[in-house]
Structures are given as C-alpha cells and as structure tokens.
Amino acid sequence: MLTKSLSPRFLLSVALALCALAVPSFGQTETVLYTFQAGTDAALPYAGLVHDSIGNLYGTTLWGGTYNNGAVFKLDRGGHERVVYSFVGGNDGIAPAASLFLDKGGNLYGTTTRGGSSADAGIVFKIDATGKETVLYRFTGGSDGGKPLASLLRDRSGNLYGTAYSGGYASCLCGTIFKISPAGAETVLHTFGLGADGQFPLGGLIADSSANLYGTTKGGGAYGAGTVFKIDRTGSETELYSFNPGNGTDGSQPSGNLARDAAGNLYGTTLEGGDQNTCLNFGCGTVFKVDPSGNETVLYAFGDQPDGAGPSSGVVLDHAGNLYGTTYSGGPGGPDGFGTVFKVDPLGQETVLYHFSGALDGGFPHCSLLIDRVGNLYGTAFSGGPPETGEGVVFKIKP
C-alpha cells in the first residue's frame, strides 16, 4: 500500500552506492518551472510529462489535490499551474503513478494504482478538456489484472493498451497486458507468468507500424531477472530477450518504457545489474539495446559516483541516436545522492547533464523525460522545494 510517508527508497527498493564512471558535464542548466506546495495542490510527482501543441505540460502526482488521493495537473508556458482533477478515492482512483496520454481533442487518459472498487486494484480514466473525469474501467485484481503502474497507448480507433503489474493467473498474479475499447470493455491480450514467461510489467507499451506491441517485465524470464517482449496483432507473445545478471555484466529488472529507432532496435534501462561490484553487489543498473534478432548489448553500466544509480524509467531517443534518462539516486552525494539526468551517446559514452541536490532544485527523479525540438529536457522530481512546503518540482534542462 502506498502512503505519503513512504520514503523514495522504499518505493523503488534500490540498492544505492557511490558512482565514478561517468563524464560529468555542468554546461547544462536546470530551471525549476514549478514547485508543488502543501495543501490542496498536487504533490509528489512520480511520472513524466506530456505536452500539447502550444507548450502546456500535463502530468500526475501520487498525492495531493483536494482529497489527497492524487491529482492531474496542467502547467502553462508562463509557469502557472492548475490542478485539473483531484481523485476522490472509493469508486474513483487513488495514486496515479504513470504519465498521461493526450489526444488531439485535448482528452487525457491514464491509470491509477489503487481505488476503483473494493478490490482497490486501480482504474483507467479519461479527463476531457473541461476537467470532467470518466472512469473507463475498474480493475478487479483477478484475471483482468490489477495495479496498473504504467502509461497507456492509444490507437486511431480509440482503443487503449496498457500493462497491469498484478492480477492474471491465480497461481501467480504476475500481471497482464490489456486493451480497453472506447466503450470501456476490457480484453486481456496476454497473461504473464507461465514457464519462462516474464512477470510483473512495470513499464508501458510502444508500437511499431505493424501494430506490434513491445514492453518489459521486471521479473520472470529464463533467469528470473526480467524480459523484453513483443505482442503481435493476434495476441501472441514472443520473448525477445531474458536478462541474465549471472553473467556478471547484464542488467536486471527492466522497469521503464522502451524507445525504438527506425531500424527496429529497442532501448531501455534496468534498475539493477551491470557492474556487480557496485550497489552492494547488485549492480547500479544499465542502459541496454536489443536488436530485431533479440541480441542484447549493454551500452552503459552505472558504477560509482557521480554517474547515478537506479535508472528505472527508461530512455528517450533523439534524432542523432543519443539516449536521455534519469537515475533515481546517486550522483556526487554518493549513497545518499538525489539522482541525475544523463545522456548516453551511440558509442556508449555517458554524460551527466545534471545532478540534483535534493533542495530547491528537486531530488529523486523517477520520471521518463520529455524532449522538445531544440533538445530541452523536461521532467519531474519526486521531492524538493522549500523544506516546509516543497512537494516535488517540474524541471527543465537546457542543453
């Protein structure tokens, strides 16, 4: 059960350590676009951002809002924030932990980790341009899935696709992949957990031009350390790669969304693994690539300060093939570091673009990043702001 008193480390269960293999860069500057406040404001942002055609940013927070059950917020280009919707609890959702999907009509779609029914298994919701919320589906936590922790994908027909972290087979409750029709009917496309299949999908889905879906699971696979998978139009699943940290260099526990290039290569991060001599011998995590044939390459392994530790939210890809992401901890503060924003180039060279201090600039970024046309990066930090009132920040990193 998520509560506001839980520490960021408990939320991710990340083994922290010092980091020393990166190339620090301090030419980039951070701007705090907004600091969340106590009271009825949104609080504790745990996910990334989406933007509309005029540059407004939208996101979710785990807590805050009128009922302290989480909120959806809008931040305009002038830095003015507005709570678009406050979750009520009960039949409504509680604690949205994923980023939103914004359609051309200005409707926002997302998930909550809790609420919806007595099962407390979460919901899929829609918020229209006026701020009116509609619960599209309430999970039961049974065969349909439960506790969705990831963002949604929407097709041209208005169907929504996503992952549920739990539910599915009664013997495992290892999660599902689901589809929600515009009318709110749910179809389970795949149930995780049998044999060497993946288990516990934390990240969302991406699609190719043939409507194949790709994603990751935190556990399961041939070695119990997570998988990269593909689901075709018929619902048939293929395990593209099973992580094997036992080989001493591979990653473990992929927990974020994937990125895909024009050649069909998939890129992502693992929460642990890589250099087994770091982070209490669990490894501080990796950035990886999986080619269309299922061959994996570790592009970068996080080590000791100041490169960060625990990259949990995946990466975004620019036109030059550079990858950008966040680490939830590490940096110059060592085991108690407040996280970093990083870049990995096509040759596997990592650059720390920014390291958080945990003060007014924010700390513990769990989010995936949003990149604009000129290379500015936008994201959220789970904590930070004035000590008395700060409940996390929205930030911009300028290249």
How does the language model describe each region?
Residues 2-399:
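Extracellular beta-propeller repeat domains
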